[in-house]
Structure formats: C-alpha cells, structure tokens
C-alpha cells in the first residue's frame, strides 16, 4: 500500500480583497497577518515529518514564492523536508459580499479536487488539514481507518442552536431539506456540523466528495444572489456533502479534536494529549509561534532523539495540552497584549 499524502494549505489574500479572521485579527493582506499562518505551516510540516517520515507531504498555496518569516528561510526548510509545493488558483472563490468572514475557506474544495486527482492509486489515502494542526503520533491508524470507511469526518460537537459562522445546525437542516427536495418545512433530524479542519479519504471517496461539492457550489452562488440562506463556509458545505454521500460522522474523532486553549472558553482536558492530531485554533499567535522557533532550530529539543512520550510532553507544555502551565499563561498574556499593539488594522 502506498504512503499517505499529508497536506495543508495557505491562501494569501490581496490588498482590497481582505476578509475577517477573528482568531488572528488584523488586516489579512498584511505581512504580519500572513506570517502567523506561515509559522503554522512550518510547525505543521515539522511535526508531521518527525512522526510520519515516510509520508508524502504537500503544501497548497496561491503564492508563487514562499516567503521568509522572521528571517527564517521557509522555502529551504520545506525543501529539506521534501514538501512538495503546489501553486493552485482559487477556482471556488466566493464573490465579494458572500459572507463577512473566512473567505479563503472554500479554497479547500479546490485542494480536495487536486488531491483526489493526484493520489497514486485507488487505495491511496490523502488528507487535508488546517495548518494549526499538529501531529503528535504516526498517522498509520488514521490511514487504516480512512481505507476502511472511505473518508473520515470529525464531529465538531456543535449544539443544535449554536451558531457556527452564521448558521446553526438546525438552520443547516432547513437548507438540507430544500436541497434534498423536501422544502424548508420538511423538518427531520438536526444534522451534525462536521469540522472542516480535516478532510481525509481514499482517492475514490475524495473524488466523490469533490464532485458533489462542485455540483453544489453553483446552487450556493444562486442562493447568495437571491438573498437565500446558504452555506457560508466550507464546513457547512462539506457537512452536507457527507450527508448526501452517506458518509458516517465521527470516524475521525478517535484521532483528532478541535481544542480551544484561550483564557476563556477553554475546552482542553486530560486525554487530549493522547490524540494523534491536535487542532489548536487559539495557539496560532501563542504556542505555535514559540514552537516555530524550536522547529526552525535544528539543534533544539524538537529535533533531538525520537518523538517519544517525553517529546510529546514538551510539545504539550509548549502548546497547552492537556493544560496551560503557569509559565505558559504568563507568556501567552504578554504575547496577547503585544499583538494588540502590533496588529495592523
């Protein structure tokens, strides 16, 4: 069986075409903002290379040249790890005014399409993860599960009336009913909001997901033009695609979780340290920034020895899993205040 293809992505927005990204803040076309994500990219591939040395690694982006960050030669680092960089245009870019935030998220649909078309064989597994995800263990069990199920999905544990990017699952269900031909009043079970931080599956299933998403996108554009409820971001749309294809929900839950580590609303808990992948939205400007320094230093603890339990404990202490230490709390507070001053508006 072929090695998995592990990918992440970054779409750099242009001046005048910015969107809103609340977890980072600031102007999305600025060097400051984009450096936050490039640091995440470095950490993503560094961690995966440590625990998945035999995997294929690929970066999708719209930039022609990967920039240096903080004086660090990002492109050379990725080349040393054997990361393939694919410059991919944004074919699924929503029109201006489609939704007020997260305008780059539909880029994932283009990434999934390209990934499905380039996997080497029918049993090959590819995965697309957000760049603020960190591998802590080898991906073998996740890959085996993807072959078994065809695709893996993460139940993001969003309540029926909890809004996620402008829609609650109950409101999503009304759109499902219309798309399924039953009309908005058809009712039915409230659907599960499937997290968009992971799209993983075999070549055949990823191709089916891409086909279904491509077929659905014109309807979303029509609804936008008509002022009708629509899927505002890729996770809304992919949740419906999984529903339509009969792909079960929650098969990725044993491997990955969305872990909030902010000063308020934290969801991190004991047991998270045992997961294969940590998705850490709140650590983009905090722990992942410090991890970037370690990953960029070939003599640091990050590259020393084998990625064993001691390595994972050091990783967890840096990223706040399974909890924030007093030292990390103090460093995070200082960084959060500094970011408020330095962040371009």
Task: Show which residues each predicted segment covers.
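Conserved donor-nucleotide/metal-binding helix-loop-beta segment in metal-dependent transferases, i.e.
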Residues: 135-174
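Catalytic core and acceptor-binding pocket of nucleotide-sugar-dependent glycosyltransferases
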Residues: 180-283
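Short aromatic/hydrophobic "clamp" motif used to bind/position activated sugar donors
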Residues: 126
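Short, acidic, metal-binding catalytic loop of nucleotide-sugar glycosyltransferases
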Residues: 47-55
């Amino acid at each position: 069986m072929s090695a998995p293809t592990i990918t992440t992505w970054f779409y750099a927005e242009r001046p005048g075409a910015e969107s809103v990204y609340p977890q980072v803040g600031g102007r999305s076309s600025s060097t400051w903002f984009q450096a936050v994500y490039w640091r995440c990219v470095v950490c993503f591939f560094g961690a995966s290379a440590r625990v998945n040395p035999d995997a294929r690694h690929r970066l999708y982006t719209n930039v022609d040249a990967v920039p240096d960050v903080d004086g660090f030669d990002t492109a050379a680092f990725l080349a040393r790890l054997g990361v393939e960089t694919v410059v991919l245009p944004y074919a699924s870019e929503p029109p201006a005014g489609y939704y007020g935030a997260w305008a780059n998220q539909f880029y994932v649909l283009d990434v999934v399409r390209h990934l499905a078309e380039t996997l080497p064989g029918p049993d090959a597994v590819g995965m697309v993860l957000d760049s603020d995800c960190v591998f802590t263990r080898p991906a073998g069990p996740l890959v085996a599960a993807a072959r078994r199920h065809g695709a893996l999905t993460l139940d993001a544990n969003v309540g029926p009336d909890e809004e996620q990017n402008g829609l609650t699952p109950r409101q999503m269900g009304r759109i499902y009913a219309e798309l399924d031909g039953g009309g908005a009043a058809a009712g039915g079970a409230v659907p599960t909001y499937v997290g968009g931080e992971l799209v993983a599956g075999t070549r055949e299933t990823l191709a089916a997901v891409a086909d279904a998403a491509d077929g659905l996108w014109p309807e979303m554009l029509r609804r936008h033009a008509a002022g009708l409820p629509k899927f505002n971001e890729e996770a809304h749309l992919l949740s419906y695609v999984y529903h339509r294809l009969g792909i079960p929900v929650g098969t990725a839950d044993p491997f990955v979780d969305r872990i909030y580590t902010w000063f308020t609303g934290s969801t991190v808990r004991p047991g998270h340290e045992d997961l294969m992948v940590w998705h850490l939205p709140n650590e983009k400007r905090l722990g992942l920034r410090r991890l970037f320094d370690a990953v960029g230093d070939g003599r640091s603890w990050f590259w020393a020895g084998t990625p064993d339990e001691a390595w994972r404990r050091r990783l967890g202490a840096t990223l706040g899993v399974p909890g924030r230490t007093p030292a990390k709390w103090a460093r995070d507070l200082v960084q959060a205040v500094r970011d408020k001053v330095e962040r371009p508006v």
